């Protein structure tokens, strides 16, 4: 169901050092940065990222966090976005569509739920 979990940080280098060590102890490779400065840790079963919030505000347990849900097709990404927006969610960031991530191409749609939690649907083309 989940594709990734992202948490916010106010000190990326301290977070990278911590997660490289803690996740490294579990056999996870060191984190890799993306173009937005987030540090990504990926396994065959999913990904974890840490980064400063994209809105420029201070990180907290909710600001800077994202919960990503897996979508089997690009059409499901769009359907997720449309259904969520119609049910009280708010479309955020770029419009739904293809992106280039640190591990290859993907299709994304981002929403905030009625409580303000940031979620997304993500499809990774084969």
Model-derived features: positions:
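N-terminal beta-strand motif that seeds the catalytic metal site of vicinal oxygen chelate
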Residues: 1-16, 67, 125-126
């Amino acid at each position: 169901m989940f594709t990734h979990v992202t948490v916010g940080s106010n000190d990326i280098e301290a977070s990278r050092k911590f997660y490289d060590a803690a996740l490294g102890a579990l056999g996870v490779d060191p984190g890799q940065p993306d173009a937005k400065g987030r540090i990504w840790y990926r396994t065959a079963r999913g990904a974890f990222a840490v980064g400063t919030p994209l809105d420029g505000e201070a990180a907290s347990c909710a600001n800077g966090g994202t919960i990503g849900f897996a979508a089997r097709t690009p059409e499901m990404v769009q359907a997720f976005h449309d259904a969520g927006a119609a049910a009280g969610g708010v479309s955020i960031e770029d419009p739904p569509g293809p992106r280039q991530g640190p591990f290859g191409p993907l299709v994304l749609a981002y929403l905030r739920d009625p409580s303000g939690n940031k979620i997304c649907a993500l499809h990774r083309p084969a």
